[in-house]
Amino acid sequence: MKQYQSYKCNKCGNVVEVQNVGGGELHCCGQAMEMITKDLTSVVLMKAFAGESMARNKYEYFAKIAQKEGFRDIAEHFQRAANNEKMHAKLELKAYNVLNYDKEFGNTSENLQYAIDGESYENVTMYPEFAKVAKEEGHADIARLLDMIGKIEIEHENMYKSLKHRLDSGKEHVSDEEEEWICEVCGHVHRGKKALKVCPVCKHPIEYQSRLNSKK
């Protein structure tokens, strides 16, 4: 038995993660639980990734507080550390992906699907369950907050679905109807069913032309 290994009850489906290693076996429903962790390195990489990601966000919040309080040097230290944590998280996620999928990151279509799945889990399962816990413990304001955030995740899921459909159908820079396309570099606006291959003003290529209505 090792710390962070997960064990499952084959009768009720209960899963527990080992925090403190002791002797003997883990039991549930009158029987020994089965160890289901196949690769502990993957588990600790994801824990490290989560920890570094949280630290990065916290340090950025702390940097803004220090900035408001007039401690500019401390703010810079917080921000520098936040940037370091971001890189640590990236390295850990890349290592996890290589270990499990033989590549550092997926392509954009695959990443959009990953985002869709994540947002779906958040709005269907995670936030409703978290809001229920807060409500049961008498934290009505927190329950409402979690519920409202969960509804926002529905919009995120729909946004990613729309983007993936557009990308997969080859219409990232093509539309069935006339639209306004804006150059993200100089702001030139063109109306038509296709984005311009090259901006006539600043000469940036089609990659810098996007739908104006998606920016509003």
Where are the regions that the model predicts?
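Short solvent-exposed loop/turn micro-motifs enriched in small/polar/acidic residues
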Residues: 1, 9-11, 19-20
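Cys/His/Pro-rich metal-binding microdomains
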Residues: 10, 26-29, 184, 200
